[in-house]
Every structure is written in structure tokens, then in C-alpha cells.
Amino acid sequence: MGVEPPKPKAEVILVPKNSPIQSVAQLKGHKVAFQKGSSAHNLLLRALQQAGLKFTDIQPTYLTPADARAAFQQGNVDAWAIWDPYYSAALLQGDVRVLKDGSDLKQTGSFYLAARPYAEKNGAFVLGVLDTFSQADALTLSQRQQSITLLAKTMGLQEPVIASYLDHRPPTTIVPVNASVAALQQQTADLFYDNRLVPKKIDIRQRIWQPTQQAGEKL
């Protein structure tokens, strides 16, 4: 029902600081940890494609963020594709290096989902919810220190981690999905299908709700 702007600095591929791996192309043959089906999985697929590699050129290690962090710290994997705040926590702990972020990978931002029958019956309310989320994000940025303190307490993380997390987030206005975002997400769906990660092709346009009362770009 809605989408955030991309946050290319908030998702990365990490390697140990002293790793000989200096480029995505050099991940060939190496173990890379990430959560299957996640945005980090998408980041990795796009980075490999950009570097001229196939998914089969690496050794994927499917792990939750907590387990991936442990495996990475213990040297059981060679690289780790991950998002914030896990990325910020690892970065501030030290001994890691960013191999690649999403700056030039044309990813979408996070999506907000709703049951289609509900959205179709309550379009005005859905738009109000998206606007409220956007206002909350603006408040988080305008009252930065209060937000850092509150989020650190709520998420159980140190304040410097939250500060880094916020630094990686551009201002976020959440809006209904338009044609350009749908096209980018279609690329992701096709990429997952081409790598046999989903069983059949997905037409993203059929999965997107648009408010009928809002004029705009058609999918």
C-alpha cells in the first residue's frame, strides 16, 4: 500500500577489516552470510550481477542476522550482507570494512502491506496512516537526541548505534507505489525468479494497491 524512499547507505556487504577481498568480484568461491529472501539478499544479487557474477559463483550461507553476526565474527563466513541497525552495530564494534553498499544498485525502499479488500474499502484511512508514518519520521529527525535515547531504550541498543542508524536514513516520506517503483520491484522479482528463489514469475503490478481518489501515474 506504500513505500519508503531507498536507503542505499543502510544496507551493505561487510568483510573483515583485514580481508584480502577488495571487490564484489572477489567474492567468487567465498561464503557469504545473509537472510534468505531479505532485502540484503536482493542487495547481494544486484551487487553480484553488477560485478558480472552469478549467484552460483558464491557459497550462500542462509542465517538470521544474529546467527550471521556470530558466524562473521568467528570467521566462519567471508562476508556478510546485512541491514541497519545490525550494520551500524558491527561497524562501531570495529574490525569490519564495507565492501559494497546500495548506492548504485537501484533498489527500492521498504514496503508497507495491507490486505487488498481492506485497502480498497478504506483508502482514505490507509493514506492517513501513511501520512502519520511520514510525520513520525520527520519528528524523529527534528528531535534527534530524544529519538536516539528513546530508540536505544526500546531496541536495546547503545545510543551510538542508533545515531549511526539514523545517519544512514534519508528523510522518509511514505507514499503509494508509483510506476517507477513498481518497475524497480519487478526487477527484483525477476532477479529472484531467474535465480530460482521463487517458484514462478510474479507480476508486481497485480500486487499493488493504488488509491482511486488520488490522481497520478498509472502502473
Go through each PLM region and give its residues:
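Secondary-structure end/capping motifs
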Residues: 120-199
